[in-house]
UniProtKB/Swiss-Prot annotation:
InterPro entries: Ppm1/Ppm2/Tcmp, SAM-dependent_MTases_sf, SAM_mthyl_Trfase_ML2640-like. It comes from Mycobacteroides abscessus (strain ATCC 19977 / DSM 44196 / CCUG 20993 / CIP 104536 / JCM 13569 / NCTC 13031 / TMC 1543 / L948) (Mycobacterium abscessus). Exhibits S-adenosyl-L-methionine-dependent methyltransferase activity. The lineage of its organism: Bacteria, Bacillati, Actinomycetota, Actinomycetes, Mycobacteriales. Belongs to the UPF0677 family. S-adenosyl-L-methionine binds at D128, D155, L156. It comes from the Bacteria. Its EC number is 2.1.1.-. It is an enzyme of class 2 (transferase). One of its GO terms (biological process) is methylation. This is Putative S-adenosyl-L-methionine-dependent methyltransferase MAB_4607c. Gene3D superfamilies: Vaccinia Virus protein VP39 (3.40.50.150).
Amino acid sequence: MRVDGDTWDITSSVGATALGVAAARATETLRADALIRDPFAQILVDATGKATGWERLVAGDIDWPDPEAGRIYDRMVDYQATRTHFFDEYFLAAAAAGIRQVVILASGLDSRAYRLDWPAGTTVYEIDQPQVLKFKDSALAAHQPTAQRRGVAIDLREDWPAALRAAGFDSAQPTAWLAEGLLPYLPADAQDNLFRDIGVLSAAGSRVAVEGYEGKLVLDESEEEAVRREQVRAAFKTAIDVDVTIENLIYEDENRADPAEWLDAHGWSVTKTDAHDEMARLGRPVAEDVERGTFRGQLIQGELR
């Protein structure tokens, strides 16, 4: 369970979810019809220094004791590939519009500072826990970013705006912000504070992109559905020896603001794309039976009015 002031590295708590996301990007990269190409994802997964279940997943070396677990992983890869592609396009459009300052909030194992074709003069700020940034710095030490990359080692529940400014951030310049895979790991009030701080730090012409969710991440279910979910989770753990119980890491606050509505009410012109619709558009439709049992992601973009 989460507690105030908790911390983590890349193999524990919230940090472990970033490793799973990197594994999904690495898996996608190996597909013939890949939506994204991320050669750094495999490097990051391998850098854990041991033969992990995530490595076996990427290699396809998994004997699933329950086929449904493998199907869920495939769906996870499709979703991660879709949202990565969506936010890649967001950044490229921001760069084409002349934005040269980028902030990735809770960056985890994001590799965009290394793999996107940034215009000259672009600075990418990555904010995350100190141990997470330390791991990535070490794993990618032999590789050069395609923009000026600056790590900002701080928890987003602390005074991150001051740390960002200390790293060289210029609030007089337009910024492209990204909060991807972040909001459920923040309490509702911390989410409001995050958006408020983004607004204060944003100059005219700034843009923001957010991954939101329609309804609950952990859906209401019948007793039979709960039993089946636990069976699949056990199969996943048996296959890859990893147990990330998402319910213990997120905040399901009932008073959480809808991100698109909050941003629209605070000076941003917002567009919202349903993630399942985007998956279908990109040729990765969600099967009807899987769709009924999963949350619906919302891919949100805004431009400061």
